[in-house]
Amino acid sequence: MTYTPPEPKLDIAELRLSTQKAVAIAWPSAPTALGTEENGVIAQKDVAQSPQPSASTAKLITVLTVLQKHPLGLTEQGPLVTMNDDDVERYNRYYSEGGSTITVHRGQQISQRQLIEGTLLPSANNYADSLAVWSFGSLEKYRQAAQKYVRSLGANRTTIGSDASGFDPSTTSTAHDLVLIGIAAATQPLVRTVMAKKSTELPIIGKKDSTNWLLGTNGFIGGKTGNTDQAGGVFVGVAEKQITSQKKITIVTAVQGDKSVNQA
């Protein structure tokens, strides 16, 4: 399916962070939050945010949870994962439901790194589920591990649902929690590196572009897009901001549940 990610109305280029001055932010209409690596969540619209479907931003949780169990260095490909009938069925199901997919075949071997890149960049739902099942043995065991992981981040209003992709609306979160998850992604070296890529090369299909078309604009170096009928437009953005000649900070924003992807 063709996907246009949300463009946040928070202008990273104009943001001024200071310990002496409050930050004036023109908030979007949707639930929104802002944070930094150093300080966590520093501002949010509507403190009493209600959990809403996270859509594909849940894939950040998937990859971070898997890397807790199966860490990879920046240049490592990791183990080869052999696709089986269940993996093919996942592809067929997501494809039939209009979800983002990448074709797989029984007996095909895909490295852990390729599964991660296919999950984060073109946002393949079947790759996310296959990665989680390979790592934990089942989606239920993945769900338990991921739930424990997000709690360790302080994302206490995030619930991991029935899949690892976020396609099912049972995975829910808040903009506040998505900023915490985005900070975790920005501080994980491999995830930060992968998020910054505009495209990846994958088995059989070749080059696939990132859904995050904001990369390289206004300081954006990463993040994750999300969009479903139930979730609306969801976006976690990671940007770098030079605040002094010697200091650069990483800013994470989250916009959740806007009426459409383009309005988020």
Residues of each region from the PLM?
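Domain-terminus/edge residues, biased toward the C-terminal soluble/receptor-binding domains
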Residues: P169-T172, D177, G182-A264
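Active-site-adjacent loops and short helices of periplasmic peptidoglycan-processing enzymes
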Residues: Y3-H176, I183-A186
